[in-house]
Amino acid sequence: MARTVHCIKLGKEAEGLDFAPYPGDLGKRIYDNVSKQAWADWIKHQTMLVNENRLNLADARARQYLARQMENHFFGSGADAAAGYVPPSA
């Protein structure tokens, strides 16, 4: 049986993550409060941030920026929008 959490991002009960996706206290908070669906949404947003801002993940500052954005996305006022991103029109 799948583990469920009350997802802080979706505001409903949903399937929880299988393991903490990030080390430390932030990873534990995410594991306890974020669903698989919300985590997948974050991965898509993180990919846009990396691509649109041309972040080099070998740079510690870029990784720190993404960690702050991840915390804001789930537990704060929301992550930055991807600069220059234009959603496709239907």
Swiss-Prot record:
Keywords: Iron. GO terms for biological process: cellular response to oxidative stress. One of its GO terms (molecular function) is iron ion binding. The keyword Iron applies. GO terms for cellular component: cytosol. The keyword Iron applies. Pfam families: Iron_traffic. SUPFAM superfamilies: YggX-like (SSF111148). InterPro entries: Fe_traffick_prot_YggX (IPR007457), Fe_traffick_prot_YggX_sf (IPR036766). Could be a mediator in iron transactions between iron acquisition and iron-requiring processes, such as synthesis and/or repair of Fe-S clusters in biosynthetic enzymes. Belongs to the Fe(2+)-trafficking protein family. This is Probable Fe(2+)-trafficking protein. The lineage of its organism: Bacteria, Pseudomonadati, Pseudomonadota, Betaproteobacteria, Burkholderiales.
